[in-house]
Regions:
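Active-site catalytic motif of lipid deacylating hydrolases and related acyltransferases
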Residues: 19-75, 159
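Short glycine-enriched nucleophile-adjacent loop
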Residues: 89-97
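Gly/Ala-rich beta-loop-alpha elbow adjacent to hydrolase catalytic centers
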Residues: 81-85, 89
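Lipolytic serine-hydrolase domain surface
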Residues: 22-30, 37-41, 117-210
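Sec-dependent N-terminal signal peptides
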Residues: 3-12
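Sec/Tat signal peptide C-region and signal peptidase I cleavage site
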Residues: 14-18
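A short, hydrophobic beta-strand element of the alpha/beta-hydrolase
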Residues: 106-108, 128
């Protein structure tokens, strides 16, 4: 188990000298309904190795895509979002496959109602924190060409409270931190093992965890 986790976290790694650019997307509705994304953004901006953090409406995928295409090719790219914003992250990261850009995606309760975007082979790491009891609002688990490594984390939180839940926020912040500064990836490893210790299934590229 520990060896598999270490292999997964190696997929998060980028050269220590490379900066990381981050795009975060709000969920459906007024931005204030996704206030947890602003909280995550504030924490992510303080992480070592993070170069820039952009926070957008989930519909601003073209803007995020254009900025990512123009970003320094030595930078790592991370896309994250809550609800429809998680789907937006998948959409932008997947589109970057046509530009031969790798990406990391961190989704918090992506929705089955906001577009069924697949994982793609240019995604070095995909992390999906989801909940089954949300009438589909926060239970989308994408399929597709496998990402470098995929982690599904089931946390049974109501959809409306997921973005502000401390564990959901730590899932996102620690994952960004592991990309931006590989020397700190052990923090994500420890967090997942402690807070989602039960493993339902796993193979070489995917693990399904739950609390």
């Amino acid at each position: 188990m520990r060896k598999l986790l270490l292999a997964a976290l190696i997929c998060l790694s980028s050269p220590a000298w490379a900066a990381t650019d981050v795009w975060l997307f709000y969920g459906w509705g007024p931005d204030g309904w996704s206030s947890g994304i602003d909280q995550i953004a504030r924490r992510v901006r303080t992480l070592r190795g993070v170069n820039s953090v952009h926070v957008y409406d989930y519909r601003e995928t073209q803007r995020a895509y254009n900025e990512a295409v123009a970003a320094n090719h030595e930078h790592s790219l991370v896309f994250g979002g809550y609800s429809c914003g998680g789907n937006a992250s998948l959409a932008v990261a997947g589109a970057l496959a046509h530009n031969s850009r790798t990406a990391h995606v961190i989704a918090l309760q992506p929705s089955i109602w906001c577009g069924r975007y697949p994982t793609t082979s240019n995604m070095r790491y995909f992390q999906d924190t989801w909940s089954s009891g949300t009438f589909g609002l926060g239970s989308y688990m994408p399929e597709g060409p496998p990402a470098g490594y995929t982690v599904f984390v089931e946390r049974p939180n109501p959809h409306g409270a997921a973005d502000t839940d401390p564990l959901y926020q730590r899932d996102a912040v620690f994952a960004v931190g592991a990309v931006a500064d590989p020397s700190r990836r052990w923090i994500l490893e420890r967090h997942l093992m402690r807070t989602a210790p039960h493993v339902d299934r796993q193979d070489a590229t995917v693990i399904w965890r739950r609390e």
